[in-house]
Amino acid sequence: MSFKVVIEPRALADIQDGIDYYEDQLEGLGERFSETVDHYIRAISHNPHYQVSHKDYRAVPTGRFPYLIVYYLDEPAETAYVMAVFHTSQNPKKLPK
């Protein structure tokens, strides 16, 4: 069963920051980052319970980019809320609550 995915404003800003950063590093890399994030967000929709689970949230690593897509599930609404796209070098205490 697929869940609806809602991307919260902070996560949208995180994604745009990542795109801008990678595009500044190498032309086309920002687009690859965006495509990678989109791929994993679709994976969350199709299999929301699969990824790493923490007390208050779940997180899926983005493969070749050092980011986690942080989300929580609203089981009754069958919705996954993406709260952040979090660079793994950041302090985990900065994760949204």
PLM ranges: what are they?
Residues 12, 38, 88-89:
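Alpha-helix N-cap/helix-start and coil->helix boundary motif
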Residues 31, 72-97:
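Enriched for short, Lys/Arg-rich terminal
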